[in-house]
Every structure is written in C-alpha cells, then in structure tokens.
Amino acid sequence: MRQNDFENTSMLKLVMSLAIPSMIAQLVNILYSIVDRMFVGQIEEVGNVCLAAVGICGPIVTLLSSFGTLVGIGGSIWLSMCLGQKNEKRASQILYNSFVMLVVLSICLTLGFILLKHNLIYWFGGSDALYPYANTYLTIYTLGTFFALMSIGLNYFITGQGYATIAMLSVCIGAITNIMFDFILIRTLKIGVAGAAIGTVVAQFISCMFVLCFLRFKSKIKLHKEELSIEKMKHIVKLGFSPFLIIASDSIILIVMNMMLQKYGGDMGDIYISAITVAQSYFLLITGPLLGISSGTQPIFAYHFGSQNLKKIKEAFKIVISFAFLFCLVMFIISMCYSNVFVAMFTNDAMTMPIADRAIKIFCLGILMMSIQYVLVDGITGLSNVKLSLFLSLNRKLMYLGCTCLLPAFLGVSNIFYAQPTADIYASIVTIICFIKIIPSYLKSHGVK
C-alpha cells in the first residue's frame, strides 16, 4: 500500500492522488442510497410510493450519518496537522479519542431514533400511504447505525494519513456488497424496502470491519488504547463542526422541502416527493464527488498549515479549485442534455418523470459557482479557521432554508426547486469575498509565510 508524501510530491500529483480516490469513494458511497432508490422505484405496482417513502427516509438517514462526518473530518484534520508537526503520539491519541466518540454517538443515536421514528416520519413529510414503507426502511437502517458511523467516520483517518486508495477501496467494497444484496433481496426474493435497508446495513458492516482492521494493523498511526481526553474531544468537535453542519443542515433543508411539498402540493404531494427524490439522487452525483475533491484534499491544507508553508497552500488552492470547476462544468453539460435518461432509471410514472427532469435542470443552475464555494469552505476548515468556515456554511444554509419556505408560498410549489441555485450562487459570492479579505491576514497572523 502506498502512502502519499505531503512534503516532497509535486502539488498537482499530490492533489490528484488524494482527490481522485476520494471522489470515487464519495461517488461509490452515494450508490448506497441511489441504488436503493433505483431498485425500490421499479417495484411492481407500489414502486412510486416506495420511492417516495425512501425519499422521506433519505434526509433522516443522512442526518444520522453526518455525526460520523463530525468526528471523522474533525479528528482527521487534527491528525494531519500533527503529522505535519511530526507529532505521532498526539496523532495516535486523536485517533483513539475519535473512535470512542463514534462508539458513544452510535449508541445514543440508535436509541434516540428508534424511539422517535414514528413521529419523525410524519413530521418530515410522510403520509399514511408512505408510512408502512418508510417505517420498515428506517427501523432496519437505524439498527445498523454503529456500522454506518464507524465506516464513515474512521475512513477519514485513512485518507488523513495519505492512504487515499485504501479509503476508496473500503467504500467500494461496501457499495458492491449493497448492489449485490439489493438485487438478491429486492429483485429475486421480492422483500421490497426491507431488502434495500438490509442490503445497506450488511454493506456497512463489511466496510466497517475493513476500516477497523486496516487502522488496527496496517496504517502508520494505528488504532490502540490511549488516554481519553475531554479537551481533545472538544477540539475534534470544533474542527468537524463546519462540515458536519453542511451535511446535517442539508438533511434538515431536504426534510423541510418534503414538508413544503406535502403542504403546498395537495393531492400531488407524494408525486412531488417522488420527483424530488429522483432529482436529489442526481444532485448527489455532483455534490458527492465535489465533496470528495474538497474534503479529500483537506489534509494538504492541514499539513502545510502545520508546517507553515504559504507557497504550498496557495498552489494547492489553485489546483483544487481548477479541478473542482472542471468537474462541475462537465456535470452541468450532462445535466442540461441527459437528465431525462437518469430519471427513467428510477421511475416510469408519467406524472413524476417531467417534474423530476425539470427539477434536475433547475438544481444544477448554480453548480459552477458551487464548485468554488465547496473548495474554499473545506480549505478554510483545513486551515483551522473554524469560525469563518462555520459562518460561510450557515450563510448558505440559511439562504437555502429561507428560499425553500418562501418560494412555494409566493410563487407556487413548482418553483421550490429554485431554492438550490439561488443559495449556491449567493453563498459562493459571499465566500469568495470573505476568502480574499480575511485569509491572507489570518495566515500571516499564524506565522504562515
């Protein structure tokens, strides 16, 4: 297995060696939800209802998983800084404290969501027609929360040590397992949404075991018992809170969107939720790899911030932004030309298909600007400026939430989709201005030259 050399590898090669495996890992990771929805949407007679039910569960499931990101990104950024400072002892302590945090969080979240799931489904846009399917899916998935948080959270520590290909492999193993079980349980054994949830949990279990074994026996910084520290745990949360907020608030906004679609959609409420589920699935094909680029290259910024190398930080930003923009440009062209092909993979319902196709095209209007915003916010987090990255994250989410609530009320339910590009373009402009005005002096004040 090859570990990346942050100090001596050329920046372009280093960025590509971290970004591409991380992109692929994120892309494969979203197949967990997308493949579930594809198989579920094709179930005979009840496919469209099942698709909407899984769509209701999607943001709730992502909200659960975001706690893995909280610990994973926060801990791995700090670990990378410690490696840049040649402090392997502290890096080992960070890894163990993060592991304990994930164990405790998984237990608390499992109990909490099991107790509240009935209310959550109805609060977040469910109807009587959707409830049986949503309840089945959410119950099974929640019971596997431990495996989900471990596989998601600890995988960041593999990337943070430079083993990007291994991190990608762990996700690929889980995704391939999920696809196999979905085919067997849904298509062959015909057990519906339960099969989709079971397949996901089994896949996360296998991925979890792979990650634990690698960190225990193979990585440079190995997982073993260290002293627990509340102060270290607080700092992990501090570093991980901004990316956690991005993912968690995305889930909350999608939940609110489902609620607005039911409220203003009338008899078409479930159909709108099916359509938005398809559109959101497509958008994940953009935001997932984009997050892979921005979060996968965070260790570069963290390492060179730790070693106080301004030249390397500047070079990294230029290359990462260029790569992210190029990716989003390609996806923008595909979105405008071939979105109908993607919609047909999920449903053949005549009422759902045109709504979903239109939603995809509208969602993607702001992705070119969004590419810059993602890289800058995650890069700022990598530079340990948590307050600024948190502000920029909240700024975008508040705009998105406001548009989601106001657009259907004043312009009709079909225009709720414009909330996405409006928030993306607005937030990107604010982020660019703040980055130019604040970051140079911030780096100088921390001795980065």
Where are the regions a protein language model picked out?
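Short alpha-helical transmembrane segments in multi-pass integral membrane proteins
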Residues: 1-19, 79-146, 188-241, 301-366, ...
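N-terminal transmembrane alpha-helices
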Residues: 6-38, 42-46, 59-74, 78, ...
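Residue-level signal for transmembrane alpha-helical positions in Major Facilitator Superfamily
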Residues: 16, 31-32, 71, 112-116, ...
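Short runs within selected transmembrane alpha-helices of multi-pass transporters and secretion channels
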Residues: 141-159, 167-175, 196-211, 290-294, ...
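Hydrophobic/aromatic residues in alpha-helical transmembrane segments
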Residues: 20, 36, 75, 116-117, ...
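Helix-terminus/linker motif at the lipid-water interface of multi-pass membrane proteins
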Residues: 27, 31-51, 121-128, 184-191, ...
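Small-residue-rich hydrophobic transmembrane alpha-helices
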Residues: 51-111, 148-167, 258, 273-339, ...
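Transmembrane helical elements of multi-pass membrane transporters/channels
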Residues: 17-36, 140, 174, 203-207, ...
